[in-house]
């Protein structure tokens, strides 16, 4: 692997350009190199992408720590036992999480690149697509095929005042220097559910707020069972509502919602938005070359992972497909094989597994009941 962070005017001779150095980008680049192709892997910022840096790895490390706190206190369920654990040094716990992230990023990403001589890693600023290649900083890279794997980022919901209160997201929550006494979580999907329970077990008073209900993508019975478990642990759930306003004053952050036609206010030290993510497609020149995106900016791809422009593919969180790290790597591998080998692999998520790292854990494989009915299948 050669690091080409220099200012040549143009570098050609590549068979494939991969934009993004996360799980999808690495999967695509390695697949291309294994096929004997010369690959330019274009990163921007910290190598490794969402999962290892700010997603799966740090959140699961903290969830595991919170489990230790909870299980110690749960010993009293058994006659003759008692136990108690608490967070004595939040900053040390956060630092241990950061150390784990650094170690895994090095082992799983940075140390892997030198094994692939046909992959040139380039980190010289954001890339912009042009006809037949991309521009990166002051340089132009040329290749007949390009795979976009630039990932996604957290976004704030549209609530009056939310831009002014210093709202946290799933990344900044785990970077707090001081453990808060109370938190409001907006969004009750799998990210919100995992982080809300984790912080509650750390001793934080948690209110979880959602327009619909907890885990809206799960079966209703599962959602209800998990909601009961959360409430038994002291988490306050506010669901079936609309957001009105949010403000910050000396008392903290106050969120006002409308529930059953009546205003309800809840106050906490911070508000954490886990209400969704958006694709990293801004300023990439997609419109100029005709790459179709949906209303949220995600790149629309076919079953072969190709975009609306021939020769340009996309995979991972930047697309309108499944937002899981293993599906990102899977889709990127298909895209690379189709792009550089001319094969016709098709994205298939019919038996896709998924899991929510709550307690109790929630997992599934394939279609849910509602999805199966929508697909015209007989459900008993």
What feature does the model see in each segment?
Residues 363-380:
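Structured beta-strand/loop patches that form or line metal/cofactor-binding pockets in enzymes
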Residues 14-41, 192-201:
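N-terminal Rossmann-like FAD-binding beta1-loop-alpha1 element of flavoenzymes
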Residues 2-14, 30-37, 42-179, 212-216, ...:
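Glycine-rich flavin
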Residues 163-179, 265-341:
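FAD-site-proximal beta/loop scaffold in flavoenzymes
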Residues 56, 150-205, 209, 237, ...:
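Glycine-rich dinucleotide-binding loop and its adjacent helix/turn
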Residues 8-24, 179-189:
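Beta1/beta-strand and adjacent pyrophosphate-binding region of the FAD-binding site
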Residues 17-19, 127, 141-151, 185-186, ...:
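Short hydrophobic core segments
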């Amino acid at each position: 692997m050669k690091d080409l962070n220099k200012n040549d005017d143009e570098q050609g001779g590549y068979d494939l350009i991969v934009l993004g150095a996360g799980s999808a980008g690495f999967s695509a680049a390695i697949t291309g190199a294994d096929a004997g192709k010369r690959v330019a892997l274009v990163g921007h910022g910290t190598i490794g992408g969402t999962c290892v840096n700010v997603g799966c790895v740090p959140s699961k490390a903290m969830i595991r720590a919170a489990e230790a706190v909870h299980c110690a206190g749960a010993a009293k369920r058994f006659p003759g036992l008692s136990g108690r654990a608490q967070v004595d040094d939040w900053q040390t716990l956060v630092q241990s999480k950061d150390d784990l992230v650094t170690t895994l990023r090095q082992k799983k990403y940075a140390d892997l690149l030198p094994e692939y001589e046909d992959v040139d890693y380039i980190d010289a600023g954001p890339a912009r697509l042009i006809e037949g290649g991309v521009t990166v900083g002051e340089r132009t890279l040329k290749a007949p095929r390009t795979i976009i794997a630039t990932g996604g980022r957290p976004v704030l919901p549209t609530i009056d005042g939310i831009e002014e209160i210093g709202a946290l997201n799933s990344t900044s929550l785990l970077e707090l220097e001081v453990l808060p006494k109370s938190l409001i979580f907006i969004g009750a999907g799998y990210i919100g559910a995992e982080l809300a329970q984790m912080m509650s077990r750390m001793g934080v008073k948690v209110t979880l707020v959602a327009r619909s209900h907890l885990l809206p993508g799960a079966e209703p019975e599962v959602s209800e069972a998990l909601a009961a478990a959360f409430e038994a642990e002291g988490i306050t759930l506010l669901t079936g509502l609309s957001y009105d306003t949010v403000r910050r004053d000396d008392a903290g952050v106050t969120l006002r919602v409308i529930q059953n036609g009546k205003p309800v206010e809840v106050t906490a030290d911070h508000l954490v938005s886990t209400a969704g993510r958006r694709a990293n497609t801004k300023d990439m020149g997609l419109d100029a070359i005709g790459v179709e995106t949906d209303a949220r900016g995600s790149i629309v791809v076919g079953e072969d992972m190709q975009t609306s422009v021939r020769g340009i593919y996309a995979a991972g969180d930047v697309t309108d497909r499944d937002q899981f790290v293993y599906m990102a790597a899977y889709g990127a591998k298909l895209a690379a094989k189709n792009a550089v080998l001319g094969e016709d692999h098709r994205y298939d998520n019919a038996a896709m597994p998924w899991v929510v790292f709550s307690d109790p854990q929630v997992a599934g494989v394939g279609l849910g009941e509602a999805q199966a009915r929508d697909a015209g299948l007989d459900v008993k």
